[in-house]
Every structure is written in structure tokens, then in C-alpha cells.
Amino acid sequence: MSATKTLEAVARDRVGKGAARAVRRQGQIPAVIYGGNQAPQAIAIDLIRARTLIYAGGFKTTVFEIDAGGKKTRAIPRDYQLDPVSGVPLHVDFLRVVAGQTVTVDVPVHFVNEDQAPGIKQKGGTLNVALHTLSLEVAPDQIPDAIEVDLAGREIGDVIHASDLRLPAGTYTGEPTDTVANLLPPTVLGADVEAEEAAVAEAQSAESAEGKAEAEAEATNEKNKSEA
């Protein structure tokens, strides 16, 4: 489970596009904390700190204790906006964490022991991943960093369903039969190329034989004409 992280912030008394631009000029980004049957709280957080947290991974599954001028609030990121060109964070939305309530988060799926899967290591199969994240509804202090899928012993043709994974009971929001990944047989490019080349050679041979037969028939006709 992810540990709660501290995030320093500054309370904002002005909102809107003009106020947001002013915040960004100061090396911060605007953010808001909402939910928990309380009024939204506008804050600003350090740009470099926000960028580091977002690009480090696991940002949206981490609970933060946000300290805005001495007022501390536990919250989890629900969304963020990035500049489409530079990738710089522009805004973050936080959801208040309330005791006794659950949150829905998308937890990344990590595949381990791929080198111990005979279908991949010895037989050249390919791991086809259908779900890179799983949506879980859990208590904030029970959010896993990632969901591990053990590939040891897996063979070509094996299908891994959500029900095969070790998840906190009753937390997965999808269906138990959802396919997470499967092992596909290798694509035999060499055999395909050889088959194609053989087909081309056969067609060329047939064309050559047909041309030879036509030439022989024409020569016979010419001979018959000259003898007549």
C-alpha cells in the first residue's frame, strides 16, 4: 500500500483564468480540493514538486496530507491537466478522503517472472496484455501500489482472468471473467515467407510451362502450313 505523503500548498482566495495565470507565473500551479460534503478549497502547489510526483508514477493512487497554511487535509488526486505541447502540469483536482468511505482508483498491473514462463522463455510465445490497470473500490489506506501477476509456469494458450488475481475481496469493479492477459503462440515469419516464395515459384513455373506449350503449338502450326 502507498504511504501517505505530505504536500505543501498555499490557500488561494481568488479563482478564475486570470488568477490561475498569476499563480503559474509564480512557479506554482492551481489546484482544488473538493468532496466530503465540504465547500471546494482552492490551493496552489509548487510546479516542480507537482511535476516530480506526477511523472514518478502512482500519483493517482497516493493519499496526500495537504498542508495549506496550517490547515491539513487528506486527499487523493482525481485528475490533472498537462500542457499538450510541453507536458507541464497545469491543474490538479484532489478528492477529500473521508473516514469510512471508499474511493475508486485505477491500479496499475505489473507482470513478474516472465523469464519463468515456459510459454515465453522456451517456446517463444508473446504476452498479450488486455488490461494495464484494474479499477478497484477500496478504503484509501488499502490502495495497493500495483497488482502483481505472476507468470511463472504459464504456457502458450493460458488466459489470465481477473478472478485469478490476488485482490482485496469485493474491490474489483469489473467482472471476474475479464481477461487481463493471455499468452499467444509465436508468429512464424520464416514459414510464412517460405510458403509465399513457394507459391510464387509455382506460379512462375506454371506460366513458363504454359508459354512453352503455346510456343510448341505455334511451331507445329507453322510447320503444317509450310508442308501444305
UniProtKB/Swiss-Prot annotation:
Residues 196-228 are annotated as: Disordered. It comes from the Bacteria. The keyword rRNA-binding applies. The keyword Thylakoid does not apply. One of its GO terms (biological process) is translation. Residues 209-228 have a biased composition (Basic and acidic residues). Pfam families: Ribosomal_L25p, Ribosomal_TL5_C. SUPFAM superfamilies: Ribosomal protein L25-like. Keywords: Ribonucleoprotein, Ribosomal protein, RNA-binding, rRNA-binding. GO terms for molecular function: 5S rRNA binding; structural constituent of ribosome. GO terms for cellular component: cytosolic large ribosomal subunit. Belongs to the bacterial ribosomal protein bL25 family. CTC subfamily. Part of the 50S ribosomal subunit; part of the 5S rRNA/L5/L18/L25 subcomplex. Contacts the 5S rRNA. Binds to the 5S rRNA independently of L5 and L18. This is one of the proteins that binds to the 5S RNA in the ribosome where it forms part of the central protuberance. This is Large ribosomal subunit protein bL25. It comes from Methylorubrum extorquens (strain PA1) (Methylobacterium extorquens).
